[in-house]
């Protein structure tokens, strides 16, 4: 009699590992305020660095809706900037001095910080960069942000930079074109304003190519000559490593959004992601909106996450 050898079948499952990087400023921190006023000779701008108290809900949204995340890195200027509720066993605290050359410190310019995020120790190849006004509201999958080694985000073309932010976008696109040896045209790219899917190796590659140009663009506070995070995202796109697909997100400007519409969306979201953008507000409206937003977020995400003590 003949006996067939047992056949063993191996199924290879690719596990997508993604990190998140969050930059954060606590404008009420006396240590930070002292540095800001000393190095800029300007009073702290209330709107620019105002704390809405919503950071815990960003972390809760990650815990509930993004279970595929390997590690969260929180980038701050000093340890005094780290909220007391942060669980440091679950959140990697990254100080500016850990990634930014000493010659550019201290910095109060988010675009300067964005030039060096790829230098975070133990950062995964695929990482999402979140501003602290962006929130995952519904269940997300890793494939929503990365597919077959490519980032997924919407890219649009623009002709005229109507404000400083768009000037930074144009600067960044032109520099990215230089990085791939391409002459930029009249238009410039602007990625969708949501969490950015970055590839660490491509960021390192471009930084090595354009180190002098990047360093020359850096200022302590924002100026028209700055580059921003889209330098890297545009380069990744030009290298053929972006799937041009818009993320399902809702954008609110606090200057025009009503308390009712904010509350309704946060408690019953219709999009995976949300950006709630701060603008100059009077004290009365700030207090009203903050109360509404915190109430709604606490209804949406009532349970503490592993990122909190």
Predicted regions and their residues:
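Soluble or luminal CAZymes and related metallo-dependent hydrolases
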Residues: 50-54, 108-112, 224-228
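Active-site-proximal specificity loops/subdomain of glycosyltransferases
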Residues: 81-122
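Long, charge-rich alpha-helical interaction segments
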Residues: 152-223
């Amino acid at each position: 009699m003949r006996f067939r050898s047992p056949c063993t079948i191996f199924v290879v499952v690719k596990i997508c590992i993604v990190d998140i990087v969050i930059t954060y400023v606590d404008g009420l921190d006396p240590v930070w305020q002292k540095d800001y006023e000393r190095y800029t000779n300007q009073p702290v701008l209330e709107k620019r660095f105002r704390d809405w108290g919503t950071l815990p809900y960003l972390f809760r949204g990650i815990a509930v809706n993004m279970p595929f995340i390997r590690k969260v890195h929180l980038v701050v200027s000093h340890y005094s900037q780290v909220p007391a509720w942060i669980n440091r066993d679950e959140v990697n605290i990254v100080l500016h001095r850990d990634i930014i050359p000493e010659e550019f410190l201290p910095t109060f310019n988010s675009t300067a910080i964005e030039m060096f995020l790829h230098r975070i120790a133990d950062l995964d190849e695929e990482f999402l960069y979140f501003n602290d006004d962006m929130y995952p509201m519904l269940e997300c999958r890793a494939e929503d942000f990365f597919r077959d080694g490519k980032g997924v985000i919407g890219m649009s073309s623009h002709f005229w930079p109507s404000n400083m932010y768009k000037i930074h976008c144009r600067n960044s696109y032109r520099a990215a074109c230089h990085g791939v040896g391409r002459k930029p045209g009249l238009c410039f790219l602007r990625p969708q304003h949501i969490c950015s899917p970055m590839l660490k190796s491509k960021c390192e590659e471009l930084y090595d190519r354009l180190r002098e140009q990047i360093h020359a663009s850096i200022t302590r506070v924002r100026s028209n000559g700055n580059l921003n995070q889209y330098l890297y995202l545009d380069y990744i796109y030009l290298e053929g490593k972006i799937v041009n697909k818009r993320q399902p997100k809702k954008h609110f400007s606090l200057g025009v959004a009503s308390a009712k519409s904010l509350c309704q969306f946060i408690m019953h979201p219709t999009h995976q992601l949300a950006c709630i953008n701060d603008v100059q507000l009077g004290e009365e409206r700030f207090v009203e909106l903050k109360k509404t937003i915190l109430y709604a977020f606490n209804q949406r995400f009532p349970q503490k996450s592993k990122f909190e003590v």
